[in-house]
Amino acid sequence: DSQWIFLPAIKRTKRISSSNRTGKFVSSEFSYEDLGSEEVADNDYLWLADMPCPTDESLSCAQVESYPKNPRSGYSKRVSYTDLDEYRVHKIEFYNRRGDLEKILTFEDYSQYLGQYWRSHNMIMENIQTGKSTRLNWGEYSFRKGLTEQDFTPQALERYSR
């Protein structure tokens, strides 16, 4: 599973090695692992409870632990809070390999696209151990643009930047 990042400032594409997925993403509180995609089969799950959502108590959330199967993961587990009405993730707690709470990711300002896709416009990652945080703001999402896997090769990413 290759992971690449395009760096527009230097107009280059860089491969992220699997051993660096736990490293910081451009000096932020996010790691490359935090920003990558994953499949349901990549984790084992344990439902803990249905409870009020920690970010909006008027909503009910499922509290679920997930345990990564990948031994190279930087986390021993994650605890997520997903609302039961629209299945939007509101918060994820990340526990390091020693089992200590390391970071909390909070999702804010959701919008629905094409009548079905909920996306957060603000993601705040707080490092509990250092007190530092990083906010990612997303301005606009686009769907159904006809992109293929070939549009995301390192060569294509560099070509589109010209």
Predicted regions and their residues:
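Short, low-complexity, Pro/Ser/Thr/Gly-rich segments in the mature regions of secreted, periplasmic
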Residues: 149-162
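Gly/Pro-enriched, hydrophobic low-complexity segments
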Residues: 2, 6, 12-17, 21-38, ...
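Surface-exposed beta-loop interaction hotspot
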Residues: 32-55
